[in-house]
C-alpha cells in the first residue's frame, strides 16, 4: 500500500502529482486571460495545470525547483529554477502562482515570489494567484474526501494563530503517500499588502471563495 520514490524539496510526492488529475484550476485560469495568452507557471510541479492550459491553446513556460517534477512536464518550455531568484528577462501575458504557494509561512519567501511575478508579467498582463480561501481555511477540520479516483485525508492538524500545520494522506490506485506541510492564512488586507509591496494591485477575485486572486501591475 505504501509508496516511496522522489519528493520535491517541499515534500510533495513526485509520483502522486504526476498521476493526479487537475481539478477546476485550468478552467479558472483560462477564463481569466485572453485566448492564446502566454503563461509563466511558477511552481508547475509535474504539469497538472500546465498540460491543461497547453491543451486550451496557451503557450506555457513551466518553472519548478524539482528536476524530477519537470521530467513529467510535456509540451511546455521547462526551466529548473528557484522562483525566488528567477530572472528570465522575458515578460508574459499571465504569471501563475498556484498551489497556495502564497501561504508559505516565511514572509521573505512570499515577498520574493511575488517580486518574481511582478518582474515577469507584461505591463498589460495579469498575475493569477491561488491561495487558501480565507473563510474556509479558518474553519478547516481533519477529515477525508475524494476527487475523481483519488482520496484525501487531512490529519494531524495543529493551529497556532494564523499558522497551521497538517499532514495530507493521499491514496490513488492502491498506493498511499503522505505530505506534511505548514501554511499561514492571509486575509484580503494582508494579501493586498503583500501585492503592493511587490508593485502589484488586486484586480478582483476569480471564484466565490476568494481563493483565486487576479492582480495587475500597480500604476
Regions found by a protein language model. Give the residues of each.
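Residues lining the SAM
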Residues: 98-100
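Class I SAM-dependent methyltransferase SAM/SAH-binding core
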Residues: 46-85
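C-terminal lobe and adjacent flexible extensions of AdoMet/dcAdoMet transferase-like proteins
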Residues: 190, 194-219
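A short acidic, Gly/Pro-enriched loop at the edge of an enzyme's catalytic core
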Residues: 87-94
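Conserved class I S-adenosyl-L-methionine
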Residues: 1-45
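SAM-dependent methyltransferase
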Residues: 107, 128-190
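A short glycine-rich, Lys/Arg-flanked "PGG" loop and its adjoining helix->strand segment in the class I
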Residues: 111-123
Amino acid at each position: 500500500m505504501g509508496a516511496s520514490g522522489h519528493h520535491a524539496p517541499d515534500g510533495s510526492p513526485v509520483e502522486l502529482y504526476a498521476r493526479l488529475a487537475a481539478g477546476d484550476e485550468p478552467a479558472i485560469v483560462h477564463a481569466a486571460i485572453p485566448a492564446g495568452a502566454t503563461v509563466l507557471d511558477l511552481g508547475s510541479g509535474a504539469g497538472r495545470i500546465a498540460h491543461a492550459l497547453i491543451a486550451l491553446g496557451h503557450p506555457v513556460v513551466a518553472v519548478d525547483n524539482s528536476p524530477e517534477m519537470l521530467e513529467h512536464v510535456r509540451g511546455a518550455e521547462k526551466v529548473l529554477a528557484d522562483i525566488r531568484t528567477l530572472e528570465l528577462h522575458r515578460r508574459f501575458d499571465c504569471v501563475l502562482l498556484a498551489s497556495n504557494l502564497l501561504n508559505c509561512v516565511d514572509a521573505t519567501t512570499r515577498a520574493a515570489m511575488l517580486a518574481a511575478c511582478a518582474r515577469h508579467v507584461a505591463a498589460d498582463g495579469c498575475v493569477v494567484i491561488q491561495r487558501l480561501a480565507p473563510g474556509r481555511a479558518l474553519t478547516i477540520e481533519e477529515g477525508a474526501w475524494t476527487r475523481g479516483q483519488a482520496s484525501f485525508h487531512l490529519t494531524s492538524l495543529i493551529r497556532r494563530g494564523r499558522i497551521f500545520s497538517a499532514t495530507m494522506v493521499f491514496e490513488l490506485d492502491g498506493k498511499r503517500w503522505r505530505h506534511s506541510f505548514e501554511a499561514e492564512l492571509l486575509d484580503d488586507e494582508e494579501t493586498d499588502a503583500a501585492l503592493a509591496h511587490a508593485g502589484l494591485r488586486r484586480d478582483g477575485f476569480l471564484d466565490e471563495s476568494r481563493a483565486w486572486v487576479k492582480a495587475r501591475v500597480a500604476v
